[in-house]
Design a protein with these regions (language model features):
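Conserved P-loop/Walker A NTP-binding site and adjacent catalytic elements of P-loop NTPases
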Residues: 1-178
Length: 179
């Protein structure tokens, strides 16, 4: 966001920049939208949620700087080739729980990423794609799919980076009893 911030006034000029945050569940969408709203509102950044339960008009979408949405809803929005005025302004696509690429929702996330990359290549207009996950054992594969430059654009934090230590234990059971 700093790229679009006026250093003198602190105001944000986000008329040419939109951010999309994709979260897997409506509850997480609502939680993240509220969190972002409380943090970004002082800078004049408009955050809205867009799910199957919450609708936005075209005018509301145009006024929104950060859309927090589900994969299915963003898939529908970004697939519409008749109205690309909003999707062409997306400069940052954040996919939370990106490990779900290997789940039932994987094809929807793949379509979103592929569409974003294709649009980027067609318009020669860069979009930063960020994947977030707390459990991603094969992060190199996901990085390759997201076309991350692993020399400078891949950030991987091991468990010792956690602010509070994680204790792991393995408990062996020799016998199971039915309840």
């Amino acid at each position: 966001l700093g790229k679009w911030r006026n250093e003198d006034t602190g105001a944000m000029d986000l008329t040419e920049c939109k951010i999309v945050y994709v979260a897997p569940m409506k509850a997480l969408v609502a939680e993240q939208a509220n969190h972002f709203r409380s943090r970004l509102e002082p800078f004049g950044v408009v955050v809205n949620e867009l799910t199957g339960d919450s609708q936005l008009t075209k005018a509301q979408i145009a006024e929104t700087h950060v859309i927090v949405t589900t994969p299915e809803k963003w898939d529908v929005i970004s697939r519409k080739s008749s109205d690309t005025s909003y999707t062409n302004l997306v400069r940052l696509l954040i996919i939370d729980e990106v490990h779900l690429l290997h789940d039932d929702r994987g094809p929807v996330l793949e379509a979103i990423v592929a569409r974003t990359i294709r649009r980027m290549e067609q318009l020669n207009d860069p979009v930063r794609i960020v994947g977030l996950s707390a459990t991603l054992p094969k992060y190199q594969d996901v990085a390759a799919f997201l076309r991350v430059d692993t020399a400078c654009g891949l950030l991987y934090f091991e468990s010792n980076y956690r602010p509070c230590p994680l204790r792991q234990e393995l408990i062996g059971l020799s016998e199971t009893k039915a309840i």
